[in-house]
């Protein structure tokens, strides 16, 4: 960790007021980071000091001892740190990961008494990126982390999966319509079809809120189905009432949590959830009238998030469609209308102008969503 130039008085205050995370036995060469910063672990590394209280994301990638250039997949975990707090963790050589089991209180207190001697082995938190980190996580609370993080608390770039069936016997393979072992595969598609059904290992899956696949209520008429397929407010309200009954604003914490897991944790599933949740928020016109404060905050969140990703990242490789421009086009057509709250409308107009100038995205064309919508009717419902 490179030392940062910091005012001596500020450094002294942070030493006594900031939090400290000690990580023992982390192998030399490991890629280690906290929030927006990462380094290669040296022989003296024991952790990070002067960390501002709040939510932080620590991440790391182990390296192959035989070939140090081979870096493993990123893993990470969230910590809620308090003023003058001390967290003691250690590296598990067996599992090649940070053991998140709490250290004995006696060990923590002994470490606290020895902090000044340990100081030379602790890297200072880089305050240059603190504002950026806060802008990406200001709606993530300790409760958000507890609700969404996996039961084992480890955020893994690659899912730890197991086959739904053990596949030890031929009858198991037949149950999933898989050919006998050794049978020649004739195409790539056939190869994909042969892969067994997998499921995440228990306790390792990020516990995102379940988003509805049916956007309309049971027993809806064809006209209602069309309405709820164009304006997703019914589906959004279902999520808010079920998952965030006391505070609808907490959905923004989940949006930020998913983005951080993708951006810093390299979790692709988190990016997919972020897209689905954003799509639900942006296509809910009636909800904008009811939850205008939520949407004002959503614009601020998107302003900071979109500053971290290249403009062409959202373009589908196959279709060349840009998920974000099409989604935001619908959002702006609603948020910039005369019917919404004036503060929300002004902020949406400024944000639209900012994106048009920065990314050269065109929001002027009529959204495809304004075209006639073809919806699948549930069984038993016929057009009159």
Swiss-Prot record:
GO biological process, one term: spliceosomal tri-snRNP complex assembly
UniProt cross-references to CDD domains, sorted A to Z: Aar2_C, Aar2_N
Residue numbers bearing the N-acetylalanine modification: 2
Keywords annotated in UniProt: Acetylation, mRNA processing, mRNA splicing, Spliceosome
UniProt keyword Flavoprotein present: no
Any single GO CC term annotated in Swiss-Prot or TrEMBL for this entry: spliceosomal complex
PANTHER family to which the protein is assigned, alphabetical: A1 CISTRON SPLICING FACTOR AAR2-RELATED (PTHR12689), PROTEIN AAR2 HOMOLOG (PTHR12689:SF4)
Oligomer status and interactors: Interacts with PRPF8 (via RNase H homology domain). Component of a U5 snRNP complex that contains PRPF8.
Entry's family note: Belongs to the AAR2 family.
Functional summary from the UniProt entry: Component of the U5 snRNP complex that is required for spliceosome assembly and for pre-mRNA splicing.
Listed name of the protein: Protein AAR2 homolog
The encoding gene: AAR2
